[in-house]
């Protein structure tokens, strides 16, 4: 990827400024379950340490996380102070049945529920953008599941004048 000019952010982040807006963009694989799961060997302590450092800024934080499971099922949006997480891995459920939805997703099993879309934290301040992506599993091809590339416009919050 680097030879094509991409900056791979694996347990790394960059602080950038675009049009006067200060952003922090980082990347992880995604085994970043909240602290309460660390004793269960389900979490990657290295990712948790990275996220503690990553979230320690006043900048708008954008995280690329290959795996969405910590964000969907384990209170990740509530636990971590990260404004927007972009994720995939679930392939939108690989096989979609009308009226039922996704049949199977990697690491989530049968009839997993939320497989793509935008999901918000309870207070509405943090967001997960989950893409069905372009990929297939090696065993089952996509069925009734159109590959997608997600495009998101990030715009600064407009502060209203106090009158």
Predicted regions and their residues:
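Binuclear metal-dependent hydrolase catalytic cores centered on His/Asp/Glu-rich metal-binding motifs
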Residues: 1-6, 18-64, 71, 139-142
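Residues that act as N-cap/strand-start positions at coil-to-secondary-structure junctions
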Residues: 8-10, 57-59, 113, 146
């Amino acid at each position: 990827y680097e030879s094509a000019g991409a900056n791979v952010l694996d347990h790394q982040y960059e602080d950038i400024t675009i049009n006067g807006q200060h952003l922090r963009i980082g990347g992880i694989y995604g085994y970043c379950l909240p602290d309460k799961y660390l004793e269960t060997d389900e979490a990657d302590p290295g990712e948790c340490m990275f996220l503690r450092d990553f979230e320690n800024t006043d900048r708008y934080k954008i995280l690329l996380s290959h795996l969405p499971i910590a964000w969907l099922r384990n209170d990740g949006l509530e636990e971590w102070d990260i404004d927007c997480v972009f994720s995939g891995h679930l392939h939108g459920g690989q096989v979609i049945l009308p009226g039922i939805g996704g049949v199977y997703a990697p690491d989530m099993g049968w009839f997993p529920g939320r497989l793509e879309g935008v999901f918000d934290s309870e207070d509405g301040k943090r967001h997960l953008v989950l893409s069905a992506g372009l990929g297939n599993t090696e065993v089952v091809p996509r069925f009734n599941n159109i590959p997608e590339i997600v495009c998101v416009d990030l715009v600064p919050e407009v502060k209203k004048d106090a009158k």
